[in-house]
């Protein structure tokens, strides 16, 4: 389980770093409103990642299969972006995909040989 907790910390930290870099970049290239839309989606991705890790941690101890509660985060954020006129769906959705970028960074670090 120590490896699992290390992986969770690493993915969460990488997601936070990527989120900060992308937020600053979007703010500079576009505007603050678009950057805040991105930040909303990225924050939802951190919540999603935490819920997913908690469900995986419980797997085998308390339950036999993964729950679907983490999917509620995605649905709620996309519905919020669609209903609220100040929010834009694309930056929110791309912000949500930040955790996937963190997984890609982790994969590249483990696959590619270190110097």
Curated annotation (Swiss-Prot):
It holds the Pfam family CGL160_C. Keywords: Cell membrane, CF(0), Hydrogen ion transport, Ion transport, Membrane, Transmembrane, Transmembrane helix, Transport. It is a multi-pass membrane protein. InterPro entries: CGL160/ATPI_dom (IPR056309). The chain crosses the membrane at residues 10-30, 87-107. It is found in: Cell membrane. GO terms for biological process: proton transmembrane transport. Signal peptide: none annotated. GO terms for cellular component: plasma membrane; proton-transporting ATP synthase complex. Belongs to the bacterial AtpI family. A possible function for this protein is to guide the assembly of the membrane sector of the ATPase enzyme complex. This is ATP synthase protein I.
